[in-house]
């Protein structure tokens, strides 16, 4: 995949070459999308819109730390949707990991989560965020046990991932109507990088084959059900719903 690679660390130690080799990236200095190595983290920038700033994964500080400490925990809609109850903490495959926010919420309440991400740039951002998270004194211990990244296409990985999870979670990219600054910023950068999720409908059937208990699909409230398969079971929040489908028992 071609992208502009920039090293702002000043170290000059060939880190970009290592990054490119690991994730199959090719330097393209004219590309509007840039993957930038800063002294703090790896971030994605849209070079023709510098005001958008960089997008990076941070499980330790910022919004994720606030959500972990002051969010709803087990009361969060995503936790309810996957079926967390009492001692039951399902094993989850998040087949559309993105920046890992929902996966992190599930891991923080005790679920083991395997994140699938096919886009090499997004996978590199997730991997960078995980490395910093794993090294953190406060959350590193449980994060290493509960949150892992698999760089693979969901369409192929969903048919051969082992062991089978109890829950498969899907949050395919869908055009956002909301005008919130954060959504606009992230969606603009993300959609410039990965484009629309044209094959998302094809994920539902293999996800239902893989999950032993249920498949949860996050949708904006105005979006039709995935693959046009309606379900009466959903956890509904302001602006979103989590459609729930039966899996395939072992």
Swiss-Prot record:
Compartments it resides in: Cytoplasm
Gene3D superfamilies: Vaccinia Virus protein VP39 (3.40.50.150), YhiQ-like domain (3.40.1630.10)
Record-annotated membrane-spanning stretches: none
Sites where the protein binds S-adenosyl-L-methionine: 101-102, 117-118, 153-154, 171
Any single GO CC term annotated in Swiss-Prot or TrEMBL for this entry: cytoplasm
N-terminal signal peptide: none
E.C. designation(s): 2.1.1.242
Keyword tRNA processing: no
One GO molecular-function entry: rRNA (guanine-N2-)-methyltransferase activity
Claim: S-adenosyl-L-methionine is one of the keywords in the record: yes
Top-rank taxon: Bacteria
Alphabetically ordered keywords of this record: Cytoplasm, Methyltransferase, rRNA processing, S-adenosyl-L-methionine, Transferase
General function of this protein: Specifically methylates the guanosine in position 1516 of 16S rRNA.
Family: Belongs to the methyltransferase superfamily. RsmJ family.
Entry protein name: Ribosomal RNA small subunit methyltransferase J
Species annotation: Klebsiella pneumoniae (strain 342)
